[in-house]
Amino acid sequence: MRIFNTLTRKKEEFIPITPGEVKMYVCGPTVYNFFHIGNGRTFIVFDTIRRYLEYRGYEVKFVQNFTDIDDKMIKKANEEGTTVKEIGDKYIKEYYEDADKLQIERATVNPRATEYIEDIIDFVAQLIEKGYAYEVEGDVYFNTKKFNDYGKLSGQSIEDLQMGASNRTSSIADERKNDPMDFAIWKAQKPGEPAWKCPWGMGRPGWHIECSCMAKKILGDTIDIHAGGMDLTFPHHENEVAQSEALTGMRFANYWMHSAYVNINNQKMSKSLNNFFTARDILKEYDSDVVRFFMMSAHYRLQINFSKDLLDSAKASVERLYNAIGNLENLIDEVSRENISEEEVNYLNSLKKYREKYIEKMDDDFNTADALTVLFELTKDTNTNINVNSSKELVNKALNLIRELGAPLGLLQKITKGSLEDEIESLIQQRQDARKNKDFALSDKIRDDLKDRGIVLEDTPQGVRWKKIN
């Protein structure tokens, strides 16, 4: 398996620190609003990579944080007349709701920055003690000149970084720095802001130090993969490298991965430009398979343009794949022969080439676009060569292979009519029992869970009916 490493700017063989295990940290959302589909691409991309690593047999410890204290959250809390904690609680809940609908698997750990304040204070204190940070009137800055490798992740020269930092220097706070490139790792309290007691007075952590601290605390001094959106490469990830490696003297992450932007009219989708669609808005019109297919249709390091036309095209493609699955499921009920023939064994062995080709594509820096092509080749083959004269065993094995290759992409796992009917009927009965017992929370949960899997329930005078939705 080869991964493009932002740090070295080339594809490298993936060799985990511990054989068979992967320690992976992905920068998660700042929880002050619903996440937009550009953020969603990052979450879907690294969910897919995590799924594929598990498919290949790795045990993945997947950490994705919540930034629940920063300037945007303070501003939001002030606007809504509430607390930063309440804003965080609200939008973490909303994140899970949308992420679950996008079939994004829950992280092994979802740390909140505010849960690690004591660890962050200790991290900052050690950097000061080592001479990598200094305090000015309650603010603490990282001394970038002290860290000789500053700029190595983003590939920028010190001269370019200094020029850019000088151009940005305009405030009194900047003038107090030893160097324009220095960045805040602890911020003194301002009126009306939440703060914690520390050796430098009341204050709160800087954004960059939060991820460094949580990654170290949960995964250790050196991790296998650190990932996030391309826009985080500099300054966020660059600063993470500096402060983490300054503290430990060890390499922070062996592989750095970054997903490209989602664009609208050739501009990056962002809240600041007000040119975004929330994932929640999109999910009102398209289901998770369609959104994920759209994201997977381009390599994760290539920018992708967002449009309803492209989503409609993705929807048509997903329907083709589900039609192939539906054809096989219908055949299971139609074929009369149970056991596979010798000729069918040879054909089934020929289908294995699709698994091998799929793995070859995904092992090459997670090339999901080519992996989707393999899926279409497989379904075209089964549509052509499997029919009512085939054995039930062959039909089942072909069906399982399609679903197997869809799973790492988070695709093709929804129920289709004609399969798993017993499970649906059982859930409908559980829902009816819950309603009789006035357990409406359970009743609603069963209904919503089925809807997320592509099944809609209809309460009629004749009883409950169900149907598949696109």
UniProtKB/Swiss-Prot annotation:
GO terms of molecular function: ATP binding; cysteine-tRNA ligase activity; zinc ion binding
Gene Ontology annotations of biological process type: cysteinyl-tRNA aminoacylation
Cofactor: Zn(2+)
InterPro entries, alphabetized: Cys-tRNA-ligase (IPR015803), Cys-tRNA-synt_Ia_DALR (IPR015273), Cys-tRNA/MSH_ligase (IPR024909), CysS_C (IPR056411), Rossmann-like_a/b/a_fold (IPR014729), tRNA-synt_1_cat_dom (IPR032678), tRNAsynth_Ia_anticodon-bd (IPR009080)
The organism's place on the tree of life at top rank: Bacteria
Cofactor note: Binds 1 zinc ion per subunit.
Gene3D superfamilies in UniProt: Cysteine-tRNA ligase, C-terminal anti-codon recognition domain (1.20.120.1910), HUPs (3.40.50.620)
Motif 'KMSKS' region location, chain numbering: 268-272
Keywords, alphabetical: Aminoacyl-tRNA synthetase, ATP-binding, Cytoplasm, Ligase, Metal-binding, Nucleotide-binding, Protein biosynthesis, Zinc
Cellular component terms (Gene Ontology): cytosol
Positions that bind ATP: K271
Motif ('HIGH' region): 29-39
Location of this chain's protein in the cell: Cytoplasm
E.C. code: 6.1.1.16
Similarity comment: Belongs to the class-I aminoacyl-tRNA synthetase family.
Assembly and oligomerization: Monomer.
Protein name: Cysteine--tRNA ligase
The species this protein was found in: Clostridium botulinum (strain Eklund 17B / Type B)
Gene: cysS
